[in-house]
């Protein structure tokens, strides 16, 4: 199972990449897509909204289950990935290339609850 070292992770199996402009790109981990199975639907429900860390911002559905996707930090949801909305199963084949949404962190938004790759690996028994 792949856990890229350059990303941060949440307990709810989202990965987070900090971009040069300070925005955060968010997707689901390899572990999450494997647990979900074949992904058939994805929708960001909070586009353009200001959310708090831990708020549900999107839903992803597979043939087995539906799963909420959470904001890793407080901020504004500024973009959803249209490619994943059109072809959600792309997340199964490349979960770290097919991001779900981007969030602009609120001033002073804490990223303390994010884990590094080693801590995330331990949390899932890798």
UniProtKB/Swiss-Prot annotation:
<dbReference type="InterPro" id="IPR033753">
    <property type="entry name" value="GCV_H/Fam206"/>
</dbReference>
<comment type="function">
    <text>The glycine cleavage system catalyzes the degradation of glycine. The H protein shuttles the methylamine group of glycine from the P protein to the T protein.</text>
</comment>
<dbReference type="GO" id="GO:0005960">
    <property type="term" value="C:glycine cleavage complex"/>
</dbReference>
<dbReference type="Pfam" id="PF01597">
    <property type="entry name" value="GCV_H"/>
</dbReference>
<dbReference type="InterPro" id="IPR003016">
    <property type="entry name" value="2-oxoA_DH_lipoyl-BS"/>
</dbReference>
<feature type="modified residue" description="N6-lipoyllysine">
    <location>
        <position position="64"/>
    </location>
</feature>
<dbReference type="GO" id="GO:0005829">
    <property type="term" value="C:cytosol"/>
</dbReference>
<dbReference type="InterPro" id="IPR000089">
    <property type="entry name" value="Biotin_lipoyl"/>
</dbReference>
<dbReference type="InterPro" id="IPR011053">
    <property type="entry name" value="Single_hybrid_motif"/>
</dbReference>
<keyword id="KW-0450">Lipoyl</keyword>
<dbReference type="GO" id="GO:0019464">
    <property type="term" value="P:glycine decarboxylation via glycine cleavage system"/>
</dbReference>
<comment type="similarity">
    <text>Belongs to the GcvH family.</text>
</comment>
<protein>
    <recommendedName>
        <fullName>Glycine cleavage system H protein</fullName>
    </recommendedName>
</protein>
<feature type="domain" description="Lipoyl-binding">
    <location>
        <begin position="23"/>
        <end position="104"/>
    </location>
</feature>
<dbReference type="InterPro" id="IPR017453">
    <property type="entry name" value="GCV_H_sub"/>
</dbReference>
<dbReference type="InterPro" id="IPR002930">
    <property type="entry name" value="GCV_H"/>
</dbReference>
<comment type="subunit">
    <text>The glycine cleavage system is composed of four proteins: P, T, L and H.</text>
</comment>
